[in-house]
Design a protein with these regions (language model features):
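Short amphipathic, basic-aromatic surface patches that mediate peripheral association
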Residues: 444-452
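C-terminal motif of bacterial Sec signal peptides marking the signal peptidase cleavage site
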Residues: 19-21
Length: 570
């Protein structure tokens, strides 16, 4: 028996060794005779957001619920709740680097009537500039003592760019108790000039815990307001926190839908021509999950906000808690952070999520919003305690990046941005002519450091090129990686059957220069005959003394995730 067993084991070992000698399981081994086929992936094309750590600013000592807009004169405005004073507004004329003194638009105050005295707290700051230049500001009046005065939506107007304001005008009142209040106003102006205010409303449901989204209309730029209509309602639930935008020929309203285990961002929509003629109920085809990928029920996603880029793509911000806790149905706010997703030009399929603020475990960034300042600049705003124990409104800029259109050898713009991890950042621009590709990197790095020649560590940049636009999920022929330190130390690799191997890039020239606050690298890359003359893919990694950071949504080994470069051919 033992002899037979040994013979059987010997036979099995022989078979295994024979199989191994014949090559790997996919038949792509060197000796298999089968050509190597690199793994391909889906290209990551379109909009990316590069958050700028160096632009983080705290807007007040204590407070929250920040929102922002850019005015027609290019001034940037931020509004927020100050927990000590009320609703404040600050302005910036240098793109958010510095902010003027705060102006109180809605002060915390008291109301006394025959039922008693109640302190009126101010919440849910919002602001809009209308097409005619007027400013409208809105907030939520929240009486601290019940049964004295109603919860309400209040509005003020300015016709001189915020220098002076009308007296507060209460446009809607709910009930005088927290369980039957109204909340979270937000503005929208339609192409025909009609101004709308959306808000969450418990007023119609005093005998249940239900809530709807209501909307009121002004046809005279906010001077007077009509009655409200119901935008959406899920029976037995609480649609909340509405923000609406015009998207194509539709009005799209993003809400937190509470009809699940935990909140989720949903969209409800109507044609502009229909303008909410009937409510969007739970089973309506006009109600849909906003995110483009499935989300598990236990993950909390609340407080959504919607933005639309001038080029049509859409942005969705919300607060998310995706960490398991002992009490999954308890208060999720202490664990939540801000997230931003990118949607298509129909405000659907929001994907490519990023988290702007550096929030550690045990801290939070909540009640967020995303503001579109222009085609290339957005702002993330949130209430956070990430710098200490006190909640405060914070602001951070983001750079909107798109597929590159390269048609000239002159590099005048630097659209690629890397700088989310820390104070160092990289701005990268590309040019080309009939013979060469030109890449210039401008790096802000206040502590230049060299790990030594040949180490590829310290202050420097990795550049990645998929010269054939193969969109691969591994390094392969025609895909290059180039390292250059701030001193000009250079290493080149080329992909080979799933690995990086030391190589050369014929004719490559790199000119380094140290400048105040950092350094610059100028790459000249000859356009080899094997290169795709119309389209390539590009990626970069910024290296510093203490960390590295790769272009957002990119994997340094997967060229399918790199940014598309349209070169226009020859």
């Amino acid at each position: 028996m033992k002899t037979k067993t040994r013979r059987l084991l010997s036979l099995l070992n022989f078979c295994v060794l024979t199989l191994l000698a014949c090559g790997n399981s996919d038949g792509a081994g060197e000796d298999s005779g089968v050509p190597y086929l690199a793994k391909k992936g889906e290209p990551v094309d379109g909009v990316r957001i590069g958050w700028d750590y160096g632009t983080i600013r705290q807007l007040a000592t204590r407070g929250g619920y920040p929102r922002s807009i850019r005015l027609q004169d290019n001034t940037v405005v931020a509004v927020y709740e100050n927990y000590d004073t009320g609703y404040e507004m600050r302005c910036s004329t240098d793109e958010g680097s510095t902010w003027g003194d705060p102006v109180i638009l809605f002060p915390i105050h008291s109301i006394t009537n025959d039922k008693g005295t109640a302190r009126i707290n101010i919440a849910n700051s919002e602001i809009i500039q209308l097409a005619n230049g007027d400013l409208l500001a809105a907030c939520n009046y929240r009486p601290q003592t019940p049964e004295i005065t109603p919860f309400a939506i209040a509005v003020r107007r300015s016709t001189d760019n915020g220098v002076t304001w009308s007296d507060p005008q209460i446009i809607y009142e709910a009930e005088p108790r927290f369980s039957d209040g109204c909340w979270e106003p937000s503005f929208l102006q339609l192409p025909n000039g009609e101004v709308q205010v959306y808000f969450a409303n418990e007023g119609p449901y005093t005998h249940s815990n239900e809530q709807e989204i209501s909307m009121m209309t002004s046809v005279d730029n906010g001077k007077t307001w009509g009655g409200y209509k119901t935008v959406c309602f899920r029976a037995g639930s609480r649609d909340g926190m509405p923000v609406s935008k015009v998207v194509g020929d539709e009005i799209v309203c993003v809400i937190e839908d509470c009809g699940f285990v935990t909140f989720k961002p949903y969209t409800v929509r109507t044609k502009l021509s229909d303008n909410w003629s009937s409510p969007v109920l739970a089973d309506s085809p006009n109600r849909a999950m906003a995110l483009g990928e499935p989300v598990e029920d236990w993950i909390y996603m609340g407080a959504p906000y919607l933005g639309v880029l001038p080029t049509g793509e859409t942005l969705l911000s919300y607060q998310v808690d995706d960490i398991r806790h002992d009490d999954q149905l308890g208060d999720r706010l202490p664990y939540s952070t801000m997230e931003v997703a990118i949607g298509d030009k129909n405000a659907r399929n929001f994907v490519r999520c990023t988290r702007p603020f550096p929030v550690p475990a045990g801290k939070h960034a909540v009640w967020p919003s995303v503001a579109v300042w222009d085609a290339n600049t957005i702002a993330a705003l949130a209430t956070s305690n990430y710098q200490g124990g006190t909640e405060a409104p914070f602001f951070m800029k983001g750079h909107v990046m798109r597929d590159l259109e390269v048609n000239s050898s002159d590099i005048v713009n630097y659209p690629i941005f890397i700088g989310h991890t820390g104070i160092c950042n990289l701005r990268l621009g590309v040019g080309k002519d009939a013979d060469n590709l030109y890449i210039t990197c401008k790096v802000k790095d206040g502590e230049l450091y060299s790990g030594g020649q040949g180490t590829q560590k310290g202050s420097g940049v990795f550049i990645y090129l998929d010269t054939k636009n193969e969109c691969l999920k591994e390094p392969a022929e025609g895909v290059y990686k180039v390292w250059c330190s701030y001193k000009g130390d250079i290493t080149v690799w080329q992909g080979n059957k799933g690995k990086w191997e030391n190589s050369e890039l014929e004719g490559l020239q790199i000119t380094p220069s140290v400048v105040p606050g950092g350094y610059e690298l100028a790459f000249t890359i000859p356009l080899n005959r094997s290169f795709n003359k119309d389209t390539m893919r590009l990626c970069a990694t910024l290296s510093t003394k203490t960390y590295t950071e790769t272009l957002v949504h990119s994997n340094a080994d997967w060229s399918c995730t790199w940014m598309k470069m349209n070169l226009g051919g020859h």
